[in-house]
Amino acid sequence: MRAATPRSSLNSSQMAQSFKGGGSPTRSSVSRPERQTNFKVVVRVRPPLPRELSGEVPFQNVVAVNESDQVLTISENIESVVDARGQALATPGPHSSHSFVFDHVYEQNASQKSVYETTARAVVDSALQGYNATIFAYGQTGTGKTFTMEGFNKEGSIEARGIIPRAIEQVFGHIQRHANPRMRFLVRASYLQIYNEAISDLLKPDRSNLSIREDKRRGVFVDGLSEWVVRSPAEIYGLMQRGGAVRATGETKMNEVSSRSHAVFIVIAEQVGH
């Protein structure tokens, strides 16, 4: 994390990775480390999808959440499952479980607001104080990354707003409270995707195969990535929708319209004056 400067940036990323647990401590031996860190890892468990509940194989919940201790426990105890003909679809396994401690664990009914308030608000505050900050959604396809980060559904529910729109509202709320004749703010936004190891500009699709560079003034940046001056949350939402429409998508076994690329939405806020 860098020292405070008049310029700060907030990156919100959507990335995909499978979660795998190896040999890990049991619940009784798990302890929560008490230390300050620049990185925090949180886990959000999503509810089962309708197709998972109505599938041929009965749905089994193997995840237990202890929000008070921030512990996630994965059980490997699989009961015998048979189909309509009496044929075994799964065989019993040894009863065992693995527990993992995180900075925060959210159960499947956690609201978008609670996720933002306990996870993201402090990160945005850091960006507004001049530090670079990143919020990074990590998970297998179909686990709810897009819902957590963007949150908008077909009904446009206000309660369903995700981290990005809530962060934008926080940024512009800060600007409204602190702007005066001696101080003004400049907010810019960019949107990129990484697909097949190539970086392209989602807001200028003709710009592809962009390169990552670094210099003393800008730090790490994507050369040629367009930046758009925005004056309201509505303008940013428009850029998100515009960029999202050209993202690479494709069907997978887990998701009929899976995002096949990694996406990064970047907001840069600059303060001019004192």
Q: Each predicted region: which residue ranges?
A:
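P-loop NTPase motor catalytic core
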Residues: 1-25, 29-38, 68-274
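Short acidic, low-complexity intrinsically disordered linear motifs used
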Residues: 36-48
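Ser/Thr-centered flexible coil motifs
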Residues: 49-51, 232
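Short Gly/aromatic-enriched secondary-structure transition segments
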Residues: 52-66, 204-208
